[in-house]
Regions:
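Pre-recognition alpha-helix immediately N-terminal to the DNA-recognition helix
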Residues: 18, 22, 29, 33, ...
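Canonical helix-turn-helix DNA-binding module
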Residues: 58-102
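Terminal interaction helix/tail motif
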Residues: 115, 119-166
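Charged, amphipathic alpha-helical coiled-coil/dimerization segments
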Residues: 83-136
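Mid-protein regulatory/catalytic core that forms ligand/cofactor-binding pockets
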Residues: 144, 148-219
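N-terminal helix-turn-helix DNA-binding core of bacterial DNA-binding proteins
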Residues: 35-73
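N-terminal positioning helix adjacent to the helix-turn-helix/winged-helix DNA-binding module
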Residues: 15-22, 46, 62, 106-109, ...
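N-terminal leader segment of winged-helix/HTH proteins
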Residues: 1-41
Length: 219
């Protein structure tokens, strides 16, 4: 007897549920990759993630910002920062005029650890490489849309994506291969060059971000 997939009530099959199942499997593999890379550096994944977060932030970040970006509690972030400081991979200083606030910055030794960890790519990088070019591009844009939603509902801090950058001009050009413009470098670029974490990013004001997003997603 033929039983269709839709007749298996014990197995929820909404597309939303199945996508989350898929993301969960990918998250499992990413955690495994992170453990391998961190272990090779003599760190744990949270410590390595803190170094990666601070790598391109010359002015450092406060403990609260670090915790929010990593999705961990402030006490947990504080413990990891203390461990990294003992290893000489981070340094702490006062943040601006508020002498009680602590600013955390990566040291040259910390940068060296990041560079060594980067040399070993894991299975997730291989699985992305296995996608066709157009599939990579579609996935990148889908991720940007999901991340943007998570930002909007305050689930994560604003990321340094083109979609929130004051230099971003989506679909400013008629060239289908390079429709966007970055006013920071004054150059056209394509969908697959859209940034998730750009060092030159400067957050646009909310009205600019909303207008930019409208153009981007309708493009
Ligand atoms: S500065 Fe970076 S984030 Fe901003 S538009 Fe250019 S590439 Fe995108």
């Amino acid at each position: 007897m033929y039983i269709s997939l839709m007749e298996t009530p014990k197995s929820p099959s909404t597309v939303n549920h199945r996508i989350r199942e898929g993301l969960s499997r990918i998250a499992t593999a990413m955690r495994s990759d992170d453990w391998d890379r961190a272990k090779a550096s003599g760190l744990n994944p949270t410590q390595l993630a803190i170094l990666e977060l601070l790598e391109s932030r010359q002015n450092g970040l406060g403990v609260r910002e670090i915790a929010a970006n990593l999705g961990v509690s402030q006490p947990s972030a504080t413990d990891s920062i203390a461990a990294l400081e003992r290893k000489g991979l981070l340094s702490k200083g006062s943040a601006g005029t508020d002498r009680r606030a602590v600013n955390v910055a990566i040291t040259p030794e910390g940068i060296s650890v990041i560079e060594a960890a980067r040399s070993s790519e894991g299975v997730i990088a291989q699985s992305v490489d296995a996608l066709a070019g157009h599939e990579q591009e579609d996935l990148l844009i889908t991720l940007v849309k999901m991340i943007r939603h998570l930002q909007d509902v305050d689930a994560i801090p604003i990321q340094r994506m083109c979609a929130t950058c004051r230099y971003f001009a989506p679909f400013a050009h008629s060239d289908a291969a390079k429709p966007h413009h970055c006013h920071f470098v004054d150059a056209a670029f394509g969908q697959r060059d859209i940034r998730i974490d750009c060092r030159e990013h400067e957050t646009a004001d909310p009205s600019f971000r909303a207008a930019t997003w409208d153009v981007f997603q309708q493009g």
